[in-house]
Regions:
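Short acidic, hydrophobic short linear motifs in intrinsically disordered regions
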Residues: 57-66
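Short, amphipathic alpha-helical interaction segments positioned at domain boundaries
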Residues: 20-44, 109-126
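Charge-enriched amphipathic alpha-helical scaffolds
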Residues: 2-6, 71-97, 204-207
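Short Cys/His-rich zinc-binding micro-motifs
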Residues: 268-278
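Extended alpha-helical interaction scaffolds used for oligomerization/partner binding
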Residues: 121-253
Length: 286
């Protein structure tokens, strides 16, 4: 904002907002504007969630998601007005027909292949807390398995908070987009993150298996492999493998690894749709 005159920065790192700016802001900061900003902000959170767990979804599904939060049970017409206004300000998604599509999957009509993989599965509808969490972090920071991984990265590998957050997002991105453990280990290697002992590797493997099985995936329209397996067991009908491929890496104990046939990864390595992870420059450059 400083280059537009909204903030004045001084050489001693002190900054202040000019009185003229404060005066104008007080004039335009009406209850109506605040309400509009609330609705646009919540819509952006819902779009972020849609991109993270579906990539493409019917507008009616996103509408259901939007209305779950108290105070946002708007009509479908108002929902579309908010969505279209956000599209003018922030082009994260586009409306095509009766569907909302994350822009990252428009290239080469990738969204069509994603829909083909998803098949006729139902859409998982996230809770309000999940939507807010994913929109803020780009991954499920409150999930038990991800918290275990966070503790491991912090306590065992002695990583700082910013680096831990970066890696947790990368882990979610890879697993949710059909990636494998080898993809994640490659990202670790790029950042010169190494394991000090076999004991660390032995602890790491089951944590990653648990994280994988509790990750909401595009192929499953937001459901986790564990949830898909539970439904399959209830129906007693065989389904496609509900867990991603784990490739033994070095001294990883293979008895702790889910051993599935690998699938070709079809999803792009695009930045997190919530935008909060763009500070991770190496990831945003993918």
């Amino acid at each position: 904002f400083s280059n537009k005159g909204y903030i004045v920065a001084y050489s001693d790192n002190y900054a202040e907002v000019p009185q003229e700016v404060i005066s104008v802001y007080k004039q335009v900061n009406t209850p109506e504007l605040q309400e509009k900003c609330r609705k646009l902000s919540w819509m952006r959170s819902c779009e972020s969630m849609m991109g993270l767990i579906y990539a493409i979804a019917p507008l009616k599904i996103v509408y259901r998601m939007y209305r779950k939060r108290d105070g946002f049970r708007v009509s479908y017409e108002e929902f579309m007005d908010i969505l279209n206004e956000l599209a003018e300000k922030d082009g994260m998604c586009i409306v095509k027909g009766d569907k909302l599509i994350w822009k990252a999957v428009l290239q080469d009509n990738l969204y069509e292949r994603i829909e083909e993989f998803q098949g006729e599965r139902d859409f998982y509808i996230p809770t309000v807390d999940e939507i807010l969490d994913y929109a803020k972090h780009g991954y499920p920071s409150q999930d038990v398995s991800y918290r275990k991984l966070s503790s491991f990265l912090r306590d065992e590998l002695h990583l700082e908070e910013e680096k831990t957050e970066e890696l947790l997002y990368i882990v979610y991105k890879e697993f949710s987009m059909d990636g494998m453990l080898s993809d994640i280990m490659e990202e670790f290697n790029k950042r010169d993150i190494v394991f000090d002992s076999d004991r660390q590797m032995e602890r790491f493997a089951p944590i990653m298996m648990e994280v994988n099985n509790n990750t909401r995936m595009l192929d499953f329209r937001g459901y986790t492999p564990n949830e898909i397996n539970r439904v399959s067991e209830q129906k007693t009908t065989p389904v496609a493998p509900a867990m991603q491929s784990f490739v033994p890496m070095g001294n990883l104990p293979t008895n702790n690894i889910v051993n599935m046939q690998p699938k070709k990864k079809i999803y792009p390595n695009d930045p997190c749709p919530c935008g909060s992870c763009l500070l991770y420059t190496s990831d945003a450059a993918d």
